[in-house]
Regions:
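Pyridoxal 5′-phosphate
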Residues: 1-427
Length: 427
């Protein structure tokens, strides 16, 4: 590759229509006071500067109004969750009735699977009871699927199929999934897929997965932890049955921030789902009459259990407003440019250091990935990770030898990629 030119990089940042958004986030700094080059937004996003003020609004309301804060104040807590319907719908490509904020990702995953995974408990070879997922999925998803299967008295060794992804980064990561869906046929109950793979950064072709699964009578659920805020999503148009996500990565809503879930409109009127229910999923009009029998709220709100986690949701509102204002199209365009530039830097580094026996795991096709690049090193991987850390580049380590880097378009700059290049020159 041609060495990145500092003047050209400065001009790119100067002309970047999203460049000003970086000033709306707190910049973490090293012990010497210098700011980090932060490439860990795939693990924890930065804090929007508006968060302390948003929290103060709610703590002031609590202090001054106490229980009356449910019905009074800037954002009455009774309907607090409704603040997120519009932004979340735009974020994931849904109708407002199809999304709701609350809980945490794995809690929502269990709630959704409790409703949508309805396996045939027969032990014959034609029983529809198999869950299909990608191999090497995030462990919480694996544990959740194992326990869902055991909850129905079935054996995960028989009923969970994990599809190995291709080693060749030029290959289509979705192809093995489609082949396995067709092979399982009528035995397949649910495809439960991480839309963007947390380890490799692969972005799967969700419309093709949905088409293949529905063709054999199966449902499709998605874990959007590494997709929401990272890649364009059109859950409603694609026909995805259900999905859930967290908000502390690309959505910048803070550690343990509130999750979200999506239920496609075609399932809203079904009364055969084994949904687990709580009082906040009851219709709002009669909720406080405390009726004995559950009357579901409209759409995804019926899947709520408890009232809004206001102190966690206040930062979420600030972060979503920034993302909503920037727009996914602009974010994706910048993301493609940033990641392509970082990819060239890493490939050049690996070419100059064959002794490391390194390679990029993330697909080479930009349409098959988000912003993250995962670089595996057979030798001295942790040495490189530590070296980058000492030189002000904050990345993410995953055993056995992978460094993940995620230039996030909402707050990273092209100069951050230049800094990586300059640091790698001296390794």
């Amino acid at each position: 590759m041609n060495t990145l030119d500092a003047k050209q990089i400065a001009q790119l940042d100067l002309n970047d229509p999203l460049g000003r958004y970086g000033e709306e986030f707190a910049k973490p700094s090293r012990e010497n006071g210098e700011p980090w080059v932060y490439l860990c937004g795939n693990s924890l996003g930065l804090m929007p500067l508006g968060v302390p003020a948003a929290l103060k609004v709610e703590t002031d309301s609590w202090a001054k109004r106490a229980v009356e804060g449910h019905f009074e104040g800037v954002h009455p807590w009774m309907d607090y969750h409704q603040r997120f319907s519009g932004p979340l719908a735009r974020l994931v490509g849904a109708e407002e009735s199809e999304v709701v904020a609350g809980n945490t990702l794995t809690v929502n995953l269990h709630l959704l699977m409790a409703g949508f995974y309805q396996p045939d408990n027969r032990s014959n070879d034609h029983a529809r009871n198999i869950i299909l997922m990608e191999a090497g999925a995030f462990p919480s998803d694996q544990y959740a699927m194992d326990s869902q299967i055991r909850h129905h008295g079935l054996d995960p060794k028989r009923c969970l199929v994990e599809v190995t992804l291709p080693d060749d980064r030029a290959a289509d990561p979705t192809a093995p999934l489609l082949e396995q869906i067709a092979l399982l046929g009528e035995r397949l109950s649910v495809v439960m897929l991480g839309a963007v793979h947390y380890y490799t950064g692969s972005f799967f072709d969700i419309p093709s997965v949905v088409e293949a699964a529905h063709r054999v009578g199966a449902l499709v659920g998605l874990d959007l932890a590494h997709a929401a805020g990272n890649v364009p999503l059109e859950l409603h148009a694609w026909g995805v049955d259900f999905a859930c996500w967290c908000s502390y990565k690309y959505l910048n809503s803070g550690p343990g921030g509130p999750a979200g879930l999506f239920v496609h409109r075609k399932h809203h009127s079904r009364n055969d789902l084994g949904r687990l229910e709580g009082w906040w999923g009851h219709e709002a009009a009669t909720r406080f009459e405390m009726p004995r029998d559950f009357v579901p709220a409209t759409g995804a709100q019926a899947w709520q259990l408890s009232n809004a986690q206001v102190m966690a949701m206040a930062p979420h509102a600030v972060a979503l407003e920034l993302h909503d204002r920037a727009g996914m199209e602009a974010l994706r365009n910048k993301s493609l440019a940033l990641t392509e530039m970082l990819e060239a830097v890493l490939l050049d580094f690996l070419k100059n250091h064959p002794e490391l026996k390194g390679r990029i795991l993330t697909p080479s096709n930009p349409h098959h990935r988000g912003c993250q690049l995962s670089m595996f090193l057979e030798h001295r991987g942790h040495d490189l990770f530590d070296y980058l850390h000492r030189n002000g580049i904050l990345t993410d380590w995953r055993n056995p030898g992978t460094i993940r880097m995620a230039p996030v378009p909402l707050y990273n700059h092209f100069a951050d990629v230049l800094a990586v290049q300059e640091a790698l020159r001296s390794f």
